[in-house]
């Protein structure tokens, strides 16, 4: 009806919001760093402004929580701006997480750790939305498991999504080595099945040997750990 259309239009209206009132999304898994790409973005914002409005939601503690637009927010700060354009939406936690993840997965360069925690957050949100994992996918008109939905919308197989999420079980030191390419993806997945203390022991051994494990070595270490021999 006319009233609901007016409300939707009002909700989607672009507003100029002070940067000081915009807060990062809690648990945001994507890094915002002042690298060369950020400097280019800041220069663009300085010259042309923010061309795509951020999406934010009201923060119960005051101001707004950024759902999509963390890099644009930082670039605006570096460009010396005081405000940035944003669309305010009333989103519950699950809807906000899904939107935040989907928006950031469009980036060209994403670290394995970022993708891992993003998939995990989205999976948990989809499950929580209805407390069921057989949610209906409108795209294909059939019931799909939550893991399948995450994969389908990211262009990944269910198995690959699961493997990425396994990386969230790695201790921070090993996960950093995956991000920097010191440990390859497949061996890292195998190492994620080790307990934290076993991972720490492995890290010490790896430092001593000055070498990263191959996939077969990681599989062997995982097998020994499961058999209680590691």
Which residues make up each language-model segment?
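Residues that form generic nucleotide/phosphate-binding pockets
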Residues: 3, 44, 100, 104, ...
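Residues at the start of alpha-helices and the adjacent loop-to-helix junctions
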Residues: 67-68, 143, 180, 217
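Amphipathic, non-transmembrane alpha-helical secondary structure
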Residues: 39-42, 120, 200
